[in-house]
Amino acid sequence: MEEKLNNKYSIIVNKKRRYNADDFKDFKYINITSTDGRNILIEEVTNIQFNKLKEEMKKQGINIGIKYALRNEQEQSDLYKKFCEKYGKEYADKIVCPVGTSEHHTGLAIDVEVMVDNKWIINNDNIEISEPILKVMHRYLIKYGFILRYPKQKENITQITYEPWHIRYVGTELANYLNQNNLVLDEYSY
């Protein structure tokens, strides 16, 4: 079963295993528009599956969109600096990965935003509004091959604070396996 589950989407990037562009050379990336109107890149299959998830959420009366997908090293550095200025270094270290250790370098990770009253809700500033809505989305992640990358009960393993908006595409089979065995990708990959 292990060999079957080790698909190309099982590659992990974190503080222990830095991003290596060679691992992702066979992936196809496409341009999309983020919730704040920026042109961003995302891995093609990840985007296809996210659009299916998005349609599922519309049936639930929930509008979701992509705030961030692929971030290059400069964008990651800029985001880290912004978080340090806005929230302080201690908080930034818990929620924004250093350059080279972010799954956003892969294009397989997505920061999801929800729309409330025709406005996209910024997760860090309005977690009390977005989290209950995102928890509805969590129930459908596996069906479309996604996992909640940084769950609350696994912070000591992921070394990242709980992020209800951060999902990661791994494929449906691996998503099911991780869920059934109560594992995060870090536990599976090592």
Residue ranges of model-derived segments:
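Extracytoplasmic cell-surface/polysaccharide-interacting catalytic and binding patches
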Residues: 1-190
